[in-house]
Amino acid sequence: MASDEDDKQAKHLPTSSLLDVLTPPTGYIVDRALCSAYSGQCAVLVAMLAAMVRQGTAEGKGSSDLALARALERLKDRVHFLVQHGRLIGPRSASPILNMLDRFVVPVKYDERKASWHPKVCVVRCVNRYSVKAKPIWLLWIGSRNFTKDESWDMALSLTGEVDGKGDELADVNSITRRLAQQAGVEAQWLSALQELGTVRWQVPAGLRIDKLVLFTHGDLKRDLEPVPANARSVLAVSPFLDEWSVSNLVRLLPPATDPTKKPRLISTVACLSEMAKKHRLALARYNMRSLPESSQDDQPEEIDEPANEGADAGADAAESRGLHAKFVWIETPKRGELRLGSTNLTRRGWKENAEVLATVSVALPGGSYSEQMRSGLKAFDDFCSEYELGEEEAPPDDELRLQREFDDARNALVVDFVATQALQDSVAVVTLRSPLHLPVGACLRIGRIGDALMPWDAGVTSLKLPDAPAHDNGDLLRMELVIGDLSSEWLQHAPFVPSLSRDTRDVPLLHAYLGIDGVISLLNDSLTAGGNGGGRRRPWNKPHTTGTSVQNIALLGIEAVLSSWVRDKESLSETKRIVELARKCEATSEKEEKAIQQLKAFLTSWDAIEQELVKP
């Protein structure tokens, strides 16, 4: 049963899904996308890919094996997820199909002992699949949430733009996109799109003005926390993590308020405010403090583990409270409002060291209906929070803090030091380190493939053979688990194959093993059908295909559908051709699949005959 607080939240602040933002408009397909976050879960990346081929749901549930297969085939080399190295989480028991995420994930190798890759931003280009004359549409999302299942409070800026359309010119989008493309190593593939961005006009709601969009990276010198102007009459600062430097600098130009009700408002979590109060009570005393209740989702089991807490300021990256992810500052002056939102916590690490994204939006006051709606929503959010009073706090035991810091340092050092490659030697995958590891006393490190049992990796060892498995079960992402005493952390570590695993030797047989013959036939039917649903069975994407069981009789569509696919649109034809090549690799794994194989071979014979006729010079 929903609580009164749940009802209040639903009434005042309806939510929108990141997956909705990533879903292309009807008639359009995703041509390319750059998506960045600090951390991610494999299941959420699957949901994002499914949304990009219009096969997902707002909740990320219900994605089928066919939806995932279509997304993996269609979006490879087009979509890239930039995630802090060591912060992608994989399920402990999973289908090897998740190995194909290595075609999409770009691990950004920041040393977290110094700084983190932390921007939350998506840039998506969509093209009309039916008309080359239709103008491309661009989607931009700048927010505070990671690519995880967490359902905490968030705030984001979402804009739609069109080439040569009506709206505002936002040159900063080009700068952000270029930096993302450079970080992903795909700037050359994005050159024409970057040039096109200069002609895009963005639909900004009336009463709002986008003043600045910027992506900071580690080492940038011209970046700082801009203080609130001295004439601000109202300030609302929201961040799940705080430090004294940011809290003090934000209001350093404001005269101290004599009326307690006129103080700037600061919203954070109880845990963060309590920790800050131990050493920085004077800095907090400048504010009226408020906190959020625990999220109602905290008791829900997660399919994939969340990252472990990482301590004080580094923990601002790793353990962001499930109750609060939103990071923004709302400032009202006599003539206008200013909203600063993005990925940056109110910490010096966030504003000076991390890679972060920031959007600054001006709002006309009193303004039109949209600005009034936004002010009303912010007030409802503020009212939803609870008052926080400074109390006497006892410092936690020093030993507990020391052990946590030592574990955090060991984990972050391990992610940096575990520089490894993989290779197939006599069909066996061998992981080889560049140099031996030096693990802390009592530390236990285990590694393995996605979905495999983990194997111990001892200090001083420089190579390890993984258990025998089909070649297509391998991937560039290895599961890692570090245990020191009662503390543990698990993540996916990037260890690329040299030479790289090819589409023919890894992707095609992996897709075949994942789908089975009946799945390949269903996928073919889907690609031959204009609506993308050619019948046949579907199963949840994370449920395994069972070999050797009875195969459904799924009639492949006839010659009319084949001919239609050749004239429908270029993208549909390219997709069908890729699936046809996948179908050519299929082999029966049981007598029960022989009938399906014969059916498939008959279809391929017809396809070849039609192709030969249609491509005659």
Features from the language model and the residues they span:
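Terminal interaction modules at protein C-ends
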Residues: 1-338, 347-617
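Active-site glycine-centered loops adjacent to acidic/histidine catalytic or metal-binding residues
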Residues: 343
